[in-house]
Structure formats: structure tokens, C-alpha cells
Amino acid sequence: MAYNHKDIEQKWQQFWSDNETFKTVEDADKPKYYALDMFPYPSGQGLHVGHPEGYTATDIMSRMKRMQGYKVLHPMGWDAFGLPAEQYAMKTGNNPRDFTAKNIQNFKRQIQSLGFSYDWSREVNTTDPAYYKWTQWIFEQLYKKGLAYEKETLVNWAPDLMGGTVVANEEVVDGKTERGGFPVYRKPMKQWILKITAYADRLIDDLDLVDWPDSIKEMQKNWIGRSVGASVFFNVEDSEKQIEVFTTRPDTLFGATYLVISPEHDLVDQITTPESKAAVEEYKKAVATKSDLERTDLNKDKTGVFTGAYAVNPVNGKKIPVWISDYVLASYGTGAVMAVPAHDGRDYEFAKKFKIDMVPVYEGGNLEDGVLDSEGGLINSGFLDGMDKQTAIDTMISWLEEHGVGHKKVNYRLRDWVFSRQRYWGEPIPVIHWEDGETTLIPEDELPLRLPAATDIRPSGTGESPLANLDDWVNVVDENGRKGRRETNTMPQWAGSSWYFLRYVDPKNDQKIADEDLLKEWLPVDLYVGGAEHAVLHLLYARFWHKVLYDLGVVPTKEPFQKLVNQGMILGSNHEKMSKSKGNVVNPDDIVERFGADTLRLYEMFMGPLTESVAWSEDGLNGSRKWIDRVWRLMIDDENQLRDHIVTENDGSLDMIYNQTVKKVTDDYENMRFNTAISQMMVFVNEAYKADKLPAVYMEGLVKMLAPIIPHVAEELWSLLGHEGGISYAEWPTYDESKLVEATVQVILQVNGKVRSKITVDKDIAKEELEKLALADAKIQQWTADKTVRKVIVIPNKIVNIVVG
């Protein structure tokens, strides 16, 4: 008889809840294990079958570690601020708070139905004032350290998103917003910015301290984009102005025949001649509607306008024209580049189009044929002539420094983090702007600054957030009658998720972010599992905040997440990404109802390697359920009683396969190879079906190994095997090294190379002993009688060949 998943799952989930089975144990004598999932945004759609894949992986690790004697921290919470709730509220007139609370309730119900061993007493919610008090507190520490500042900056302005809001560079894809696909324009606006660039080197170098996939480390390094080169200063002719250029190729300075500066560069208006003014203004207007990606597309036609101004190349005194072009971004480097058209494809196209001189500085090739990529000896370069590239770079940097016209410099692709958002549904920034120009933080003892309730959360229309509409909240007066306005922008969704793993350690503490001793006890996170889509942003921001808190002495570790694993994507059965529009979304509620939570957990772990994307298959789901039924029937009869072939004695027939299974499953779990661990348990179950008697101790071991993957069934089987109190803290099975291989082997006996008999002997028996047994074998004696044994060839554990004549 098959097991009844509905009854069993409800029974054991109730048991875990009543007994607080998974409440985190604080025990100084136990080693710790902190297993963390990337907490979800509680959307209106609810959980999809992709979520449980990562959650099951961390749950397997957590359950195994408890059984191995670890104290385990395995929490869950909600990344609940965010755009969809605000968009929903604007459409329906409902409060995003109510919408979010309802979604959380649904998510929690779904997650609990899957039997994950979370400590729900540590649940966090980023929209809870008791939580975001500490998000605001971290902002205040950043401000005090000079890492949060206000600046008018060119931002990505999406006028059609939420009635107008700023989006981060990372949220712009192909010139449109990642969410909704709305066009993005560049617009100057005063913003709060976090100085993540101050930590750029540490964010690269400390990747050596963590066990992360190489691909993710590489993505982070590329995003930060550290490059070593030189700053070079070009004097503007007939002016006291200087244009600073960063270049990774100072060896090519003699070949610089023009400068290009960004249309937004501070000097554009100051150096443009009256004759060029109209053309420059017109060009600047045209560029304002283009995204950074469009502007830097290598395939697009090069455009630009001559400013009328000239600069002086410091190394040879030559006068070179200064152009503006959209391919130079104000936000990268100095917003100005020296163009060496003979050796750079983009500069070559530009110079060719606008008929600007080209000077080759490396020998080899012909400019008529296109840009020169040869790097032979230097030519046309004065004191650098004849040098190789690296010598020329070093020599030129020394020359620049000696003459006071440049210096060695490290540049980064990473920009400071535009932190403010023109939205309602986010953490208020705890700042007041006073009428006399002073900006102050809200005193720490007045935190949290609560997000006010509002019925109308449409954008203000001025570029400010909807909070600007709430006069009673915005306008303040201090004790001296000085008037001020609260900051009306809110924090991005990244804020609450940049430190949540710290709050799980001590979620109810109202005096500090978390107790120092508890942070020392639990950090770093031992295992962090989530989607690769967060490879750059969330992980970079969380690491940045963690390093700031480390410098403040708040956290004890340099890095927050020791091991990172990215689960693959579960695709639709048609091998496409699941989406409502394609009609291939699978709802876990339906699977739990029809097959049971354990089946879903088993199937998602058996589909393939955790880190690879795999297509959903109804057949695979059926197969997983059938195998659970097979395990059940191995031990339980139709009367729901333990089968009588489960006995206390052990005849030894399953010794080797059992010990091999314990070893492989343990190793595979530790290395998160769950699919091969399941395969090994299938092999063991097949062997167990062939055995006449099943040692109870081996059946208990099997159930313990199954418990992390199919915990409800395992609890029921454990109970039927005669145990009380649940399986969660039962001791993890161990294996006997001596039983991993057969104790005996079968040896083939040959006479003159022909097989005449076989004998079973102890493995690794001495050669002399094996020879004696072979010669004494009755069948062999029939072939050797009356013959002379000339030679005996012994291959241990395999063959004895007797040569007779």
C-alpha cells in the first residue's frame, strides 16, 4: 500500500511546529553551521517551482548538519520593499503594506507546506520599522564616514516608470528599464550616492578569501573593472584650463592627435569657441536622450562636434583639436580620452570620418589598410623609439611625473552607487534639509523614521518621490524655529537585502543591529544559495556594506558569505524559461496536493546537478513518487506495520553496499551532489529488495540518509521503526572502512591457460597460500594427475595458472 502523503505531511509539520524542532540552538560546545537562502521578494504570483530547488538544497545541508552534531542557523525572511507592490497600489488604490502582508502570508504558507526546517522565530521583513530602523542606522554610519553624499549627477531617468523615477545603471538593459522596458534618458538630478568606489580594491582582492564559483568572481572583478595606467594633463591653448585624461596606454602618447571629451564634461561650455557654440549645443541636446549602452556601441556610426578649442600634447608640444562625442561618458574615468587613431579602432573610424591626422607609433602595417595592431618597436616617439611596449609605458609614466604633467593611476569601471529612489515604498532616508542650507541626520535615538501611511502614492511630478506630497510629514521645525524638509527620496530595494543575514543572528535586538558575541559565533555565513542573476549587484552591495561594518567593528569577518552556490534554472517542459505568457508555469501547490512535498523535493534534487538548468518533466515527477512508494513498501506492509523481514541480526549480505552507500551519500551531500546521492540510495534499495532479511540498523541508516531530502516520509518510517521524538537530531550514520570492499574474492584456476575451476578465498591471501589451495582443488587435481607441474603463475586476487607437461 502506498503512503498517504497528505496525512503524513500534515502530521509531521504540526509536530515540528508544536515542538519548535528547528529553533536554533545556542550551544558553545557545538560547531556552527549557517545555511542561508537568498530571501524572496513576496510577489503576488506566489512561489514557483524554481524557489524550492535552492531551498531544498540548503535544507538538506541544514538537516544533515544537525544530525552530525552541529548547531544550525537556517532562517527565512522577506525582501518586501519593491516596485511591484507600489505599481499595484497605484493601479488599484490599495495600500502596498496590505498587498505585501497578504503576499507574505501566502508565500509563508507555501514554504511551510514543503517541510523546510527554517527557524521561523527569526523571520525578518525589510518593511518592518523594527528592521529598517537598522537599515537607516547603517545609512547614518555611511554618512558619518563620508561614504554617503549628495551630488547633482547624471542619472538614468525613466519618466514612464512609476510616473518618473531614477534607475541604477544595473537596472538598464539596452537603453530601457529592466522592469517594464520603459525608455531611459540621462538627466541631471541631486541624488544620494554611496561611495562604493572607496572599497573597490578590497572588493576585488578579498574574493581570494571566499569559496565562490570562478565565473561569479570574474563577473564581480569585471564589473569593478580595475585598470592601471596614467593620468595625463593637456593644457588648453590660450587658456589656464587643463583637460585630464586617463589612459592605459601612455606609451602611445606621441600618437595622440586629438582629444575627445564627453558632451557633459564641465569644460565644454568654457572652452567652446563662439563659432562652434550652436553646433555643440545642438549635439548636447541630441545626446541627452541616449543611454550609455547606445552611446558606447562599437558598431554604431561615430558622431561628434569640434569645440573650436585646441589642447597641447605635453610630450611633443603639438597643438591637437578638442572634440566632443557621445562615445565618451562623463561617468567613466575623467570624461575625456586622448585619441590615438593609428592604433585604436574607434579612434581610427572617428579620425577617418572627420579627416584628423594619424601618427603611427609602432612599426609594422600600413594605415591605408586600416588600424595598426602591431606592437613591434616604437617609432615617431622621440625618447621612446625602439623600446618594447612595457618599457615604453614605464618610461613614459616616469617622464610625465618628472615633468609634472601626469602620474601613474589606477582607474575603475565601477561607479559610486546612486542610492536614492523617487518612490514611496522604500525605507525613508533619515535626513533633514534645513532652510539655512545645513543637512543633518535624524538622531539615532529617534530611529526608525517611519514611512508615513499614504492613500495617494502617485509620483509628485517634480522628480521627487510621492512623499513630497505629504506636507505634514515633510515639513519640520526645530526647537529654534528653523524650518526644514525631510528627505523625500527613499532607499532602493538593495538596501534591506544588503545586511539581512546579520539580523537573523539576533532579530529581536532593539539596542543594536545584533549582539557582538552572537555575530562572532555565527559569521560568516557557511553556505549561501541563490540565483546567478544576483551575481553582481546584490552580492557586491552586501559585501560593500559588510566591509564598512567590519571597519566600524560591528562585524568580525571581512567577508559575509564563505561559500556561494548558484542553483540552475528550472525550465518549462518545452525547455523555455517559465513565464505566464508562455503558459508553462508550474505551481508548487498543485504538485504538493497531487504528489506530496517529499516528491517535489526528491524530484528537484534528482533532476540533475544543482547548478545546471533542467527542463521540468511530469514523468520525472511520477518516477520520484513511485520510488518513495518503493522505499515505503520495502519496510511497511499493507496493514501499515513494519515488515517482519526487518530483524535485529545481520547476515552480512548487505554489509558492503550499505557501507558504500553511507560513504557516498555523506560525501555527495557535503559536496551538494544530491542527484548522485539519490542514485546511490536507489542502488541500495534495489539490493535490499533481493535480501531475505533486512538488518534494522541498516534500515534506520537508510531512513536517516533519506531524512534531509524526504523528511516527512523519513519521520513516519523512523516512528514505525520504534523511535520517539523525531529524526531531526538522530545521529548521522557512519560507515566501516573495512566493509567498503568484499572480504573474499573469486579466483580463476587455469591449467595450461584453460579455465578448469574457481575458488573463493580471502582477499589479499598470500601467494604461497593461494598456490597451495589451487593445487589442492579437486577439479584441478583431475587435470594435473600423472603430470609434472612445471610452473605456477599466481596473479593475486585474480588467477592461478598451473603449467603442466
From Swiss-Prot:
Gene Ontology cellular component list: cytosol
Sequence motif 'HIGH' region, residues: 40-51
Highest taxon in the source lineage: Bacteria
Coiled-coil boundaries: none
Residues noted as binding ATP in the record, renumbered to the chain: K580
Listed InterPro entries: aa-tRNA-synth_I_CS, aa-tRNA-synth_Ia, Leu-tRNA-ligase, Leu_tRNA-synth_edit, M/V/L/I-tRNA-synth_anticd-bd, Methionyl/Leucyl_tRNA_Synth, Rossmann-like_a/b/a_fold, tRNAsynth_Ia_anticodon-bd
Any GO BP annotation: leucyl-tRNA aminoacylation
Motif ('KMSKS' region): 577-581
Enzyme Commission number(s) from the entry: 6.1.1.4
Broad class of enzyme this protein falls into: ligase
Classification via HAMAP family: Leu_tRNA_synth_B
Family to which the UniProt record says this protein belongs: Belongs to the class-I aminoacyl-tRNA synthetase family.
Name this protein carries in UniProt: Leucine--tRNA ligase
